[in-house]
Amino acid sequence: MGIKKYNPTTNGRRNMTTNDFAEITTDRPEKSLLAPLSKKAGRNNQGKITVRHQGGGHKRQYRIIDFKRNEDGIPGRVATIEYDPNRSANIALINYVDGEKRYILAPKNLEVGMEIMSGAEADIKIGNALPLINIPVGTVVHNIELKPGRGGQLVRSAGTSAQVLGKEGKYVLVRLTSGEVRLVLSACRAAVGQVGNESHELIKIGKAGRSRWLGKRPTVRGSVMNPVDHPHGGGEGRSPIGRKSPMSPWGKPTLGFKTRKKNKASDKFIVRRRKK
């Protein structure tokens, strides 16, 4: 997809860019694959804020995505490429020959009319999903499972991809987008190709109001708060934080402080840590 620029008719327009949506083929989603989506505004079931800076935004409907890709041996044809307001990647509507309709993440270069397949016997081509053990070394993949049958959990954002590096017994070595090299069970599935809409990261929001349309609320600096609200708060005028290192709102060290638990169960699957 390309990036659309605007004439600087207003200050908000001056630096704003949007997607040109050239790949999108319809603006009418498949009704049978929609579900209601209520606003959470970052609150949990007790009404307490667990994720800050969320709230408002345009009303959305959830698109039910097939992350499991378990329609084995049944050919499907790409009917549409669609925009999904709930994720950075585009989605593709697949019509299977048995009458089933499903949405999948749209990989790069997937086009309307192309045929896709799932299962161990599927060919190595864009959009097909198969167990990692059946994918050749060097292949670029996305939507990777961590447990067989659970559905893809890794590499789902726009423009991301992973690469199969090798096979060791019942595990497959995969290099993730971050640079981390990880062991994944060979029975886990992945889809071939890179996730599409790779120009998503180049989009400039341009103005505060557009962030609010996306459901993002302002981020206030701790140094301008009161001491009751943040460890950096208080003081006369523009004061230093008064601590030897920056702190989170809950008094924990931040900015470079490692938060991953030591001796975590999944450590044994990480062959090389991500790039710093």
Curated annotation (Swiss-Prot):
Coiled coil: none annotated. GO terms for biological process: cytoplasmic translation. SUPFAM superfamilies: Nucleic acid-binding proteins (SSF50249), Translation proteins SH3-like domain (SSF50104). Signal peptide: none annotated. Residues 1-20, 219-276 are annotated as: Disordered. NCBIfam families: rplB_bact. SMART domains: Ribosomal_L2, Ribosomal_L2_C. The keyword rRNA-binding applies. This is Large ribosomal subunit protein uL2. It comes from the Bacteria. Keywords: Ribonucleoprotein, Ribosomal protein, RNA-binding, rRNA-binding. Belongs to the universal ribosomal protein uL2 family.
